[in-house]
Design a protein with these regions (language model features):
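A cross-kingdom feature that marks ATP-driven nucleic-acid transaction machinery
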Residues: 1-124
Length: 124
């Protein structure tokens, strides 16, 4: 690809795609260790989440990946909450958690219950 740090900072869209790919790769590895499955999510309203984790017991978690700041984290959290409220847990299993993975350095749980975790904090 011929990418350098300078070229990535000049093309934030490509940088974002690579970051998302790295997060998905790491989530897939973690899912493999706990016998969970990782999928892309799109519903009948055409809403998407970057990933859905389905655990062995049928419970699930929705994940969004964001490189931006607080505005992007807020928007991603709202999106996850809106999607989750429309999922029929009688058919799918129960919601385990909602997660936004970021580039930051602080992990926390928001007042709305959504977890925000930097990629660097995801460890096996």
């Amino acid at each position: 690809m011929g990418l350098t740090p300078d070229s990535l900072f000049k093309n934030i869209n490509t940088f974002g795609l690579l970051f998302e790919s790295l997060v998905i790769r790491d989530l897939r590895i973690y899912c493999d260790t706990i016998n969970a499955r990782l999928y892309k999510y799109r519903d009948s309203k055409n809403r998407e989440a970057d990933a859905v984790i389905q655990f062995e017991d049928g419970d699930w978690a929705l994940v969004e990946v964001k490189m931006g700041g607080q505005k992007d984290i807020d928007a991603a959290s709202l999106k996850l909450l809106e999607i989750a409220k429309d999922i029929d847990e009688e058919k799918t299993g129960k919601q385990s958690f909602l997660l936004v993975v970021t580039k930051g350095n602080l992990a926390y749980r928001r007042k709305d219950g959504v977890y925000v975790i930097p990629l660097g904090c995801l460890k096996n």
